[in-house]
Amino acid sequence: MPQMINLGSEMLRITSRGVEYSTSSGRIWSIRYMGTSCGTFVDLLPYGSEILAVTSKGIYYSSNAGRSWSLRYMGTSCGTFQNLMDGGKELLANTDKGLYYSTNGGRTWVKRR
């Protein structure tokens, strides 16, 4: 499960303090986001012009390299999200209830049969 991603000249990672970034190939890290309103960050995924995040409160997205986050999905019918994957034409998610997919950037989810 990627807890560190590359965004061009920056790297982002999840730590116990929140989301950190590095512009020095990982030699020096600084806090990018340490708010608690999103819950605890679990996984990050670059997805088009956004970053998607699995958190303890749902799926969040950032369109400014992780400086701020907005809720994308908070439903409970899929179970607890564990990680996200870019499946090309669809977004895939492992949850404690199985594999789910989304064709609209994570706004709605359908169980893979």
What are the roles of these predicted feature ranges?
Residues 26, 66-67, 106:
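Short coil turn/linker residues within repeat-based beta-strand modules
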Residues 96-113:
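Blade-level signature of beta-propeller repeat domains, shared across WD40, Kelch, NHL, RCC1
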Residues 1-8, 38-48, 78-88:
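Repeated scaffold domains used in trafficking and secretory/extracellular systems
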Residues 22-23, 62-63, 102-103:
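Conserved Ser/Thr-centered positions that define the repeating blades of beta-propeller domains
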Residues 33-36, 73-76:
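Surface loop/turn motifs at the tips and blade-to-blade linkers of beta-strand repeat domains
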Residues 11, 19-20, 59-60, 99:
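Hydrophobic beta-strand positions in blades of beta-propellers and related beta-sheet-rich domains
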Residues 16, 56, 96:
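Short loop/turn segments immediately following the C-termini of beta-strands
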